[in-house]
């Protein structure tokens, strides 16, 4: 697991941050449309290549989260996008969850999906150059939420995902996001967030995930 720890440390070294460039095609279409640019594969690639080629990449960015489309593309210099990112000293990563869906017995809450076929996808992403991954769990706050069901289900999914990712030689970003929306107090947010994170780490330990080889977001 020392290699995973080295990857995590490289991503976060010298105060560098992680660039989230994993916007879906739909999100990129809205973003480019706002400046009257057609959302073609070529234009989406040009937008991202401009980001990844900037001088600030070398001093400010330790890791880049990519979208499935982008990790498979080549730059104008014929480098793959992961190669372009690596040449700046950053680590290429990939979003692997498939989105949040309604949680069966709690229709106001969400469960993040993407475990089906994850091992096979990770093998492909590793060959393409990815060395870390992202998975986001989403929790809402109100008088009755997040429910125990939501806390347990999302923590379990995050732990299973993390275990599979580490098996495949990559560092998992563990992202249990407690949404700020609502009329709750800051103290409520602190208490619920603490409960969520505690459960996540309980599940990570149960699934024998190496904590030195993860990044908590």
Residue ranges and their predicted role:
Residues 168-171, 176-178:
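Amphipathic alpha-helical interface segments within eukaryotic helical scaffold
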Residues 35-39, 110-117, 146-157, 184-196:
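Alpha-helix N-cap and loop-to-helix initiation/capping positions
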Residues 40, 135, 174, 216:
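Conserved, mostly hydrophobic/aromatic
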Residues 99-103, 138-145, 179-183:
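Conserved radical SAM core fold
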């Amino acid at each position: 697991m020392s290699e995973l720890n080295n990857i995590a440390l490289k991503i976060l070294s010298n105060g560098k941050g992680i660039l989230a460039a994993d916007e879906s095609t739909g999100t990129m279409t809205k973003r480019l449309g706002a400046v009257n640019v057609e959302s073609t594969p070529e234009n989406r690639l040009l937008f991202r290549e401009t980001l990844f080629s900037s001088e600030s990449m070398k001093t400010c960015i330790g890791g880049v989260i990519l979208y499935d489309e982008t990790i498979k593309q080549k730059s104008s210099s014929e480098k793959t996008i992961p190669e372009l990112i690596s040449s700046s000293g950053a680590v290429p990563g990939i979003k692997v969850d498939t989105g949040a869906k309604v949680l069966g017995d709690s229709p106001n809450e969400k469960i993040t999906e993407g475990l089906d076929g994850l091992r096979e996808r990770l093998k492909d992403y590793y060959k393409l150059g990815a060395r870390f991954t992202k998975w986001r769990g989403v929790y809402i706050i109100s008088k009755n939420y997040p429910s125990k069901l939501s806390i347990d289900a999302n923590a379990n999914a995050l732990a299973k995902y993390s275990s599979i990712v580490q098996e495949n030689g990559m560092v998992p970003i563990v992202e249990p996001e407690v949404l700020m929306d609502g009329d709750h107090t800051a103290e409520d947010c602190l208490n619920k967030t603490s409960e969520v994170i505690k459960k996540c780490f309980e599940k990570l330990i149960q699934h024998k995930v190496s904590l030195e080889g993860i990044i908590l977001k």
